Design a protein with these regions (language model features):
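NTP-dependent nucleotidyl-transfer catalytic core
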Residues: 1-169
Length: 169
């Protein structure tokens, strides 16, 4: 599949939504989501990991957490606009570059969702946030701790473990 794969997938989704109608599309989407989550739970159970709660990333937007996190950064003076996008001044907190939170098209980034989740975690009364990342996401450590500082949270309350799979012959 040549070209921009994300645009291709977005086009397929748009066509499916148009052909099915909004209600049927949401039903098919939810069925697929439930199936995938069941598969993930089964895989994790095989590793001896059973969660009490799964958190929906979608709720970060629907509950206004992403918006609140961005507003908090703005209120704290840690956002600026450049080329139509909103940027978090992550370099003020030791990151190697500033990070986009709202693209020039008005859509929030995945990092903006991380901000909302981080805010939510501490608002729900947790005294620490534990993240487990693949080793290829090591750059996220400084970024996430910078985000905590920008939100007025204690970065020492964030613990990040890196894991890497290996094949042993």
């Amino acid at each position: 599949m040549g070209g921009d794969k994300e645009k291709h997938v977005d086009g397929l989704i748009s066509n499916a939504r148009h052909l099915l109608g909004d209600a049927d599309y949401r039903s098919v989407f939810q069925t697929g989501l439930d199936y995938c989550l069941s598969d993930i739970r089964s895989d994790l159970h095989g590793f001896g990991v059973d969660h009490d709660t799964f958190f929906s990333e979608r709720s970060l937007s629907t509950d206004g957490l992403v918006t609140r996190a961005i507003e908090t950064l703005e209120k704290n003076g840690h956002l600026y606009e450049q080329d139509g996008a909103k940027w978090f001044r992550a370099t003020s907190f030791g990151d190697d570059k500033d990070r986009v939170v709202i693209r020039d098209n008005g859509v929030s980034t995945y990092f903006a969702s991380d901000l909302g989740y981080l805010l939510s975690k501490f608002e729900r009364g947790f005294d620490r946030a534990l993240y487990i990342f693949g080793a290829d996401h090591h750059g996220y450590i400084v970024r996430l701790k910078a985000a905590a500082q920008g939100l007025g949270l204690d970065p020492s309350k964030i613990e990040i473990q890196l894991v890497q799979f290996a094949i042993l012959y």
